[in-house]
């Protein structure tokens, strides 16, 4: 079986090289690369190896570590078949609490030929040490069945390690689509493996209420179930159109009631306690979110006195919110959170506070009276009043409040923590920390894991600079980072894992490791080493993008396609007749010579035969396209803004024109906001005869045409995505047209390089 030549991607050496593990008496030599994600602060190789045996014991110096020891024993027993004993006092593997320098979660791990010692500065630190120990073992340690013929040896090492940030989180939206307790636990297992310690549980939204509130039983009796909505129907369509079972609605979340097909589910309070206990053993805190005052349709539809008017539904943008003018609505919200705070024994609760439709508030006499009585001038101030009122209630319950970055707009209390999610509100972190409030980074451009992944997604996460424009004092207020999994378009557990992993690993390393340790190439190598482990765990991760080609490629004379893949366990098949590759299609085994215009279709396959993404690329045999004879006189480009609400670039010119703006580069003009449809025209000035590469990044859709030929098709609604195309151009000016649309704070960027791979400054590229 031919595998992807992932080593071709790697240029950096591993932190630790190859260890020859033959020093342990009776142990055959074992070749083992030390490869841990996230990378440790300090790792020193020593001589020898520790071998796990049937008589290995796990000792605890501190009784509170018994759950951690039992967790480790269970982890090591499944694949080995050993009945590992847990005892108080020292063992072959000893767990202890001690004075380890660093933030909460710091640990040391020493592995010698006859023992392993893990010392943490907290329970979470010991768990972090256990997860590093876990990754030192062969990936087969993850097997749920006994594996025979494996030497359970790890290299002798000394590790000193500590997290960069105290908050290393993942959010799961279980409202838009529901996930069972077992499915949530699978996610917690992956989080623990990579030292992530905060699980943000988005329990309610307009599309479903997922937690039992005993005082209000209709929230789950009715609010947890719905008829198929537009998201469900689109998922079903994609599952059929693309032959993708991961996009189908799981049957165990469907029931028939009085002839109606209903989708949903919810957690009882006993379920919640079960998950809390499971997470606690793994060193993970759970932060519950009941989003309010918006995103509450499942509540306001089932109980009177919660919304402004009896008629509930959707406004111009968002759903009918809670009525902050009614005391009955405030009482409802506090009663819900009273039950919630009793269940979750943690410091934080999350109120949401985003995307509130305020139309009703402007018409509601109760809201207007509340504003008058409290000297509030705008409905935005009324929202802040509601948030502050709830925060005082949380504080009385011994909790601190987290909210999405909209809570900044009305002013922050001293105890509020902000989750910065709106990438286009670039000063959110600066404003928050300038007021002395903590901030958690989760900008949607990088950290929304429901956004389609491309070859740049992980790098943009890994290379995020959280310190940009912040003083050292402000930097100290960064609690950490979090990835968010919004599930409108994620109907199944398999699809959720596919969207989140392996990007989750990049977030984990960003949150744990020191900035000076950042090395993208080295991370790619360590990530590559994780795929076998994830396969054995049964995780439905996404095979990273194939590299070595663009969507459109130009060549003159003779070309070649050289495909690389980061996952060494994956197998690549391809076709050239337009059909979808199968396991019976030719296997990619090395560079392919191209002498004529050829359309390639590639598909990766997991070791279990499951199909990955289908990727199409075109290699065009070309000649240099002649330039125009008359040179344009004006530098830059001309952008025409249309009031566009559609989702196809070809339809932009049908919308009314709002204005025309000169721009020096491909960009969104500063005055252009709201419903955006741009048509940017001018000429591309090719400095010389060459094959040029055009990388077009946009959120949402975009297209690029040069010399009346479409070079990049990045059309349709989507998150940040880059598509790359090439064209052979003669020196001189070439007419170009770039189209772009977006409805909510998007991105637009075009990068041009020559055949030497060097970027070309925009100052000489464009004219009109």
Where are the language model's segments positioned?
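Bacterial Sec-dependent N-terminal signal peptides
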Residues: 1-33
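Short, compositionally stereotyped local motifs that mark structural "simplifiers"
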Residues: 8-12, 514, 518-682, 691, ...
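Acidic, contiguous N-terminal accessory segments
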Residues: 24-166, 397-404, 408, 412, ...
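Feature activates predominantly on carbohydrate-active enzymes
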Residues: 102-104, 110-321, 326-330, 337-348, ...
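Hydrophobic faces of well-ordered beta-strands that scaffold small-molecule active sites
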Residues: 168-172, 199-201, 286-290, 349-351, ...
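Active-site neighborhood of glycoside hydrolase catalytic domains
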Residues: 299-304, 310-415, 422-431
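Flexible, acidic glycine-rich loops studded with aromatic residues
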Residues: 401-406, 411-416, 422-562
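Short beta-strand-plus-loop segments that form exposed binding edges in beta-rich domains
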Residues: 737-746, 752
């Amino acid at each position: 079986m031919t595998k992807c030549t992932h080593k071709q991607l790697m240029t950096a050496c591993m932190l630790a090289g190859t260890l020859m593990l033959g020093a342990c008496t009776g142990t055959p030599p074992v070749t083992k690369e030390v490869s841990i994600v996230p990378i440790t602060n300090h790792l020193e190789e020593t001589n020898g190896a520790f071998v796990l045996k049937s008589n290995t014991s796990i000792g605890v110096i501190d009784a509170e570590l018994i759950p951690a020891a039992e967790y480790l024993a269970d982890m090591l027993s499944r694949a080995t078949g050993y009945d590992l004993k847990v005892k108080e006092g020292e063992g072959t593997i000893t767990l202890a609490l001690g004075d380890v320098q660093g933030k909460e979660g710091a640990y040391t791990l020493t592995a010698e030929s006859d023992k392993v010692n893990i010392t943490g500065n907290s329970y979470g630190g010991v768990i972090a040490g256990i997860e590093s120990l876990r990754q030192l073992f062969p990936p087969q340690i993850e097997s749920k069945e006994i594996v025979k013929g494996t030497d359970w040896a790890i290299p002798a090492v000394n590790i000193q390690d500590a997290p960069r940030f105290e908050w290393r989180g993942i959010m799961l939206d279980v409202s838009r689509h529901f996930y069972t307790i077992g499915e949530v636990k699978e996610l917690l297992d992956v989080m623990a493996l990579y030292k992530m310690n905060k699980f943000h549980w988005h329990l309610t939204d307009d599309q479903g209420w997922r937690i039992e509130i005993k005082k209000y039983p209709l929230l789950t009796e009715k609010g947890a179930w719905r008829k198929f909505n537009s998201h469900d129907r689109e998922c079903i369509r994609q599952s059929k159109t693309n032959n993708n079972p991961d996009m189908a609605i799981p049957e165990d979340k469907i029931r028939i009631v009085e002839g109606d097909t209903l989708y949903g589910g919810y957690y009882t309070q006993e379920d919640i306690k079960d998950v809390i206990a499971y997470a606690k053993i793994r060193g993970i805190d759970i932060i519950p979110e009941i989003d309010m005052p918006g995103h509450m349709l499942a509540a306001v539809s089932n109980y009177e006195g919660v919304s402004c008017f009896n008629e509930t539904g959707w406004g111009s943008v968002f759903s009918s919110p809670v009525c902050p003018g009614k005391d009955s609505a405030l009482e409802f919200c506090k009663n819900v959170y009273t039950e919630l705070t009793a269940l979750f024994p943690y410091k934080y609760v999350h109120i949401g506070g985003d995307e509130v439709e305020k139309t009703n508030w402007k018409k509601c006499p109760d809201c207007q009276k509340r504003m008058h009585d409290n000297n509030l001038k705008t409905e935005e101030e009324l929202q802040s009043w509601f948030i502050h009122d709830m925060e005082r209630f949380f504080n009385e319950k011994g909790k601190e409040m987290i909210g999405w970055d909209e809570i900044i707009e009305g002013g922050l209390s001293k105890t509020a923590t902000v989750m910065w999610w709106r990438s286009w509100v670039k000063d959110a972190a600066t404003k928050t920390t300038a007021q002395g409030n903590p901030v958690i980074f989760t900008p949607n451009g990088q950290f929304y894991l429901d956004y389609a992944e491309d070859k740049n997604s992980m790098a943009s996460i890994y290379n995020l600079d959280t310190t940009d424009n912040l003083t050292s004092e402000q930097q100290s207020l960064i609690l950490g980072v979090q990835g968010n999994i919004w599930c409108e378009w994620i109907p199944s557990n398999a699809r959720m894992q596919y969207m989140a992993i392996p990007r989750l690993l990049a977030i984990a390393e960003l949150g744990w490791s020191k900035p000076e340790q950042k090395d993208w190439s080295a991370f790619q190598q360590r990530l590559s080493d994780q795929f076998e482990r994830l396969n054995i765990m049964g995780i439905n991760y996404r095979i990273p993008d194939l590299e070595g080609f663009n969507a459109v490629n130009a060549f003159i004379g003779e070309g070649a396609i050289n495909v690389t893949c980061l996952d060494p366990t994956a197998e690549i098949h391809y076709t050239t007749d337009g059909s979808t590759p199968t396991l019976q299609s030719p296997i990619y085994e090395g560079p392919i010579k191209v002498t004529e215009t050829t359309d390639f279709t590639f598909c990766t396959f997991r070791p279990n035969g499951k199909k990955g993404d289908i990727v199409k690329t075109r290699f065009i045999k070309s000649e240099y396209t002649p330039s125009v004879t008359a040179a344009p006189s004006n530098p830059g480009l001309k952008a025409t803004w249309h009031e566009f609400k559609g989702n196809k670039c070809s339809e932009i010119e049908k919308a009314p024109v709002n204005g025309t703006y000169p721009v020096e580069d491909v960009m969104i003009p500063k005055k252009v906001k709201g419903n955006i449809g741009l048509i940017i025209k001018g000429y591309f000035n090719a400095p010389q005869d060459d094959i040029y590469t055009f990388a077009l990044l946009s959120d949402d859709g975009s297209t690029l045409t040069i010399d009346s030929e479409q070079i990049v098709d990045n059309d349709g609604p989507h998150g940040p995505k880059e598509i790359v195309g090439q064209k052979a151009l003669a020196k001189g000016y070439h007419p170009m047209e770039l189209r772009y649309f977006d409805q909510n704070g998007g991105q637009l960027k075009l990068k041009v390089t020559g055949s030497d791979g060097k970027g070309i400054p925009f100052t000489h590229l464009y004219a009109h």
